[in-house]
Amino acid sequence: MRREHEMITHNFPGYTIGPDSYEEIVEICTPFGKKAVVIGGERALNAASEKIRRAVGSSIQLTGFFPYGGEASAENIESLKSIPEVREADMIFAVGGGKAIDTGKVLAQATDRTYFTFPTIASTCASCTSLGILYHPDGSLREYSF
């Protein structure tokens, strides 16, 4: 017997998707603080920075926009941790693809910050998992971070 595909809806707690999702940033994020730093890939930062600025207005202070360093590595995370604007933020906004988002997630864990992900490509699951994958600077696998 052949079964037709069924439509199933899954709701992830803390997951917002859709054309108006940026309009919900303030409501979703302000319970976690008033200052956010944005970490991401250079192209992703260029694509999303103005949209994030408009969405948060004066409700969330953006302490800075910083490239993640091109590799989700412990070395890049240590470098980001040394930036005063990162240390002063209450939250981390991780913008981009998988490695940029993983960098933001592990940075948040290392600095005891809440993070929010803003995927700019559809092919990454990094935005909806707690797993972060770290690499050595040469791109070889280093470890998984949970």
Give the predicted meaning of each segment.
Residues 1-91:
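ATP/NTP phosphate-donor binding region
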Residues 6, 58, 77-85, 103-111, ...:
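Noncatalytic linker/hinge segments flanking ATPase motor cores
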Residues 13, 109-146:
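A glycine/threonine-rich phosphate-anchoring loop and its flanking beta-alpha core
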Residues 14, 37, 92-94, 100, ...:
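Short glycine- and Lys/Arg-enriched binding-loop motifs that mark or flank ligand-binding interfaces
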Residues 19-20, 41-42, 95-97, 118-121, ...:
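Fold-independent oxyanion-binding glycine-rich loops
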Residues 22-23, 45-49, 74, 99-106, ...:
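Short glycine/serine/threonine-rich phosphate/pyrophosphate-binding segments
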Residues 67-71, 95-97, 124, 145-146:
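Short C-terminal domain-edge/linker segments immediately following a structured domain
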Residues 84-122:
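A short, small-residue-rich loop immediately preceding and capping a beta-strand
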